């Protein structure tokens, strides 16, 4: 998405919306995480609950602040993209024609170089940040009361929803901002299956985490700072919670 923005295909607002709302975990990744969390028997219910939450998020969040106020402007250095459809061609025909012309410009050399650049970016940019943020997050969660203090308002909400171990589960709703895997790994400490299922599904539905997506957004020059990223993360969490709670009651009990 960042490359598409730089190439002039998306405006800043479109790029931010796609990065924060139009991404979700693949089935295979969800299955691996269910095994990590001891929920492999609930793989299909988890998929239903997660997708039931992320679709409303994708519909509603682009219409509220801060995504709604992002500027609809293209990158300064990007070439002008012609989007007008010529007369006599349908959208499908014009799209196919553009796709063929674009494919003709790609050579094996360009393809290999682009692949090498992508994997190098993952190895040297993303992985070090993932390890740093995840390790720091685990240390802060295990040895300080920071997350317990910040997530104190969630405890009565989880109690009202009928989840056991609310005080233990509440910090897991916020650690997902650092890395998506943190709440999944921490959920193993929960003995109540419904609470573990709820935390697991919310963690996957949150999508936005600083160890990867957050860092990429900040580096992509779409004018979306860490404060705005955190607000969208909270919005996704708050919107996802009642939906996943309903599915938990329906599918687990």
Which role does the model predict for each range below?
Residues 63-72, 169, 222, 248-253:
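A cytosolic-side transmembrane-helix exit/cap motif
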């Amino acid at each position: 998405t960042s490359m598409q923005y730089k190439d002039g295909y998306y405006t800043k607002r479109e790029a931010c919306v796609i990065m924060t709302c139009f991404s979700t975990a693949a089935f295979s990744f969800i299955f691996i995480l269910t095994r990590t969390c001891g929920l492999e028997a609930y793989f299909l219910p988890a998929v239903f609950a997660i997708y039931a939450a992320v679709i409303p998020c994708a519909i509603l969040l682009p219409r509220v602040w801060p995504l709604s106020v992002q500027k609809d402007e293209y990158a300064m250095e990007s070439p002008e993209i012609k989007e007008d459809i010529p007369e006599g061609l349908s959208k499908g025909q014009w799209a196919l024609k553009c796709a063929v012309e674009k494919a003709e410009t790609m050579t094996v050399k360009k393809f290999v170089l682009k692949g090498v650049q992508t994997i190098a970016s993952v190895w040297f940019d993303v992985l070090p940040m993932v390890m740093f943020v995840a390790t720091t997050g685990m240390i802060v969660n295990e040895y300080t009361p920071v997350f317990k203090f910040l997530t104190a308002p969630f405890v009565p909400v989880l109690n009202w929803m009928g989840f056991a171990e609310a005080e233990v589960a509440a910090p897991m709703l916020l650690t997902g901002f650092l890395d998506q895997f943190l709440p999944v790994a921490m959920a193993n400490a929960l003995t109540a299956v419904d609470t573990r299922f709820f935390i697991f599904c919310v963690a996957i539905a949150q999508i936005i985490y600083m160890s990867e997506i957050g860092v990429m957004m900040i580096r992509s020059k779409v004018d979306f700072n860490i404060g705005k990223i955190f607000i969208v993360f909270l919005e996704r969490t708050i919107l996802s919670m009642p939906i996943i709670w309903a599915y938990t009651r329906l599918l687990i009990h």
